[in-house]
A protein has these predicted regions:
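Disordered, acidic Ser/Thr/Pro-rich linker "stalks" and the adjacent N-terminal cap
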Residues: 24-92, 103-110, 120, 127-139, ...
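Short beta-strand elements bearing conserved aromatic residues within extracellular beta-rich modules
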Residues: 114-116
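Hydrophobic h-region of N-terminal signal peptides that target proteins for export
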Residues: 13-22
Length: 179
C-alpha cells in the first residue's frame, strides 16, 4: 500500500497542487503572451436564472464583483438546467484565457465541463474546445481557467454541463492578448 501511495498518489497530488497554483497566475514560464482584461458589452442566457436567484440575471457575470454569499448573490441555474451563455465583446478581440468564478455546492467537481464556441458575426458559431476537470472545495469559490491560446472573435458561447446540484457562477472574465 505504501508503495502505491508513493508511486501514484503523491505525484498526483503534486501535479494537482501545481495546477491550482498556476491557475491564478497570468504569467507562465515559456508563455510570452501579455494579458489585459477585456470588457464584455453584453451577455445573454438561453434560460433565466432560477428560484430566489432569479433577480440576478446574467449581467451579474460581468459586473466585476465576486459573490459575497453563495447562490443568493450569483447567477444560478439549478439541477438539470444546462443553459448556454453568449458573451458579446462589442468588437473582435484576440482572447487568450476565459475564467469562470464558480462555487460548487453539492460536489467538488460540480462543473463537469464547459463547451466554448466562437463567432465573428453572432450567427455562425464554430466549436472551439470543451474544457473539463474543474474542482474546488464544496461551498468555496474557485476560478476555472480555460486557455484559448490566441483566438480572434467577437462572440463567445459557453455551454456548461453540471454533475450535481447546479451552476453557481459569480463572474466570467475574458483576458485579451496585448500586442
Amino acid at each position: 500500500m505504501k508503495k502505491i501511495i508513493r508511486r501514484f498518489l503523491l505525484p498526483g497530488l503534486a501535479v494537482l497542487a501545481t495546477g491550482i497554483a498556476l491557475s491564478q497566475d497570468r504569467s507562465r514560464k515559456g508563455d510570452t503572451r501579455k494579458y489585459a482584461l477585456v470588457p464584455v458589452a453584453k451577455v445573454e442566457s438561453t434560460r433565466p436564472p432560477s428560484l430566489e436567484a432569479r433577480r440576478f440575471g446574467p449581467d451579474k457575470l460581468i459586473d466585476g464583483k465576486l459573490p459575497a454569499n453563495g447562490w443568493r448573490s450569483t447567477w444560478t441555474a439549478w439541477y438539470k438546467d444546462n443553459p448556454t451563455l453568449t458573451f458579446d465583446l462589442g468588437s473582435e478581440k484576440t482572447i487568450g484565457v476565459i475564467r469562470i468564478f464558480f462555487q460548487p455546492w453539492d460536489r467538488s467537481d460540480e462543473l463537469a465541463q464547459v463547451k466554448v464556441e466562437v463567432s465573428r458575426d453572432g450567427v455562425n458559431y464554430v466549436d472551439f474546445n470543451t474544457y473539463a476537470g474543474f474542482v474546488s472545495e464544496r461551498g468555496e469559490g474557485a476560478w476555472a481557467e480555460m486557455d484559448l491560446r490566441q483566438i480572434k472573435a467577437r462572440f463567445f458561447r459557453l455551454s456548461p454541463k453540471f454533475q450535481g446540484w447546479g451552476h453557481l457562477w459569480g463572474e466570467v472574465e475574458f483576458w485579451g492578448i496585448k500586442k
